[in-house]
Regions:
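Mixed-charge interfacial surface used for oligomerization/domain docking
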Residues: 1-139
């Protein structure tokens, strides 16, 4: 029942760690593609891809998905909404700005991402994590 996703600035660390092929890495950098990775059942998988020079479109997509869950009354507010990041101050500020009027500033908790996220995703990775009332996979 945890929704945790990250938008990744560069696929360099995914490539170095063997998580993506050389061709994927090359095309991703050439066309400024940023993967949005979702953690499901303890495994990282690509949820979607966004294009752009920075993380803005990816952050917007994650926030829109949160707002969809919020409008469906599927967010469990007995837990904080976490914003894990790896040196991603811009992304943290953007997510906080988008969500503070919706959920309140006290519910938002920026945290440093774990070592696994740091190693696989690299710098400027920003995530959004929250608890759901109903599991996404049950639908």
């Amino acid at each position: 029942k945890v929704s945790m996703q990250f938008v990744i600035q560069t696929m360099e660390f995914l490539h170095k760690g063997g998580r993506c092929s050389g061709l994927t890495y090359l095309l991703g950098n050439k066309f400024s593609i940023h993967p949005i990775v979702r953690l499901e059942n303890g495994k990282m998988s690509v949820h979607s891809l966004v294009r752009g020079k920075d993380l803005t479109k990816g952050l917007t997509k994650m926030v829109e998905e949160f707002k969809t869950q919020f409008s469906n009354d599927n967010v469990d507010f007995s837990f904080p909404i976490m914003i894990p990041h790896v040196t991603g101050d811009y992304g943290v500020n953007k997510i906080e700005h988008e969500l503070k009027d919706l959920v309140g500033e006290k519910m938002l908790l920026p945290v440093e991402a774990s070592g696994i996220i740091c190693c696989h995703c690299g710098e400027n990775t920003v995530g959004l994590g929250y608890m759901l009332k109903n599991n996404l996979l049950e639908k």
